[in-house]
Amino acid sequence: MNGPSHTLPQRVTTVLHAKQYLVFFAIGLYTLDFAVPIASAWLYRHEPLAELLRNTWGPLADAVAARSAVIAAFFIVYLLVGAWLRAGYIRSLVGPFHLRPADRRQFLRLLALQLALEVVGALAAWAIVLAGDDPLAANAVVLGLLVFYFVVLYADYIIVIADVGPLRAVALSLRTVRATLVPSALILLAVTLLGSAAVGLLDENVTGSLARATPMMLVQCMIMGGVVFVADVVLVVLYLNAAETGRLKPRPRSAGDGRML
């Protein structure tokens, strides 16, 4: 065998070493995504922590179900902060450290994608609730959601790196998935299974107050933040490699950022 495929592991290793400090950024983003659904569920239902951990719908679904302006405002702030920081994080993966998007257009594009993902997640949560005790229907919803996430796996990276809109990014994400089918599927499956295992372990062991559960939740955020960081690096390298080898058209317009990897 010859060609760029031989250099992919080395490229991933090089980026992981050069960008290792970004693991703390990834942990912060994971902690935000972990804490917000729990907080919105508490604002909606005021249940004990153990119950909230076992049954979180997400801030958008909670805001609609509760018809609460407070939860809606909470969701909007989360969405704005999350998109802002996510853009800075992706820019940092392919260039110097950033905490913010490159410009307003990039921010709005990423915000639109994040909103779409939240809407799909909320619809899936409601569908699972409607499925009730029918495991076949619930599993079908989960499988459909997993397929959707597989299609858009690279979309946020592409918005930032290739400077395109969300619809174009989804189309390019699908092309990237097709060009890197096996590694993309393995990464999504690994992150999903590890995340589910971590959540399941937390659900089984959290029975007390927030103060008693906090250390275990922090450990989960640190471990899964590290896992997500590694997955992000691999996915970014896979996307750039697919673009640079001509398997995607058009090539990323901001190719200068990609050369840093």
Features from the language model and the residues they span:
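Hydrophobic alpha-helical membrane segments
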Residues: 1-261
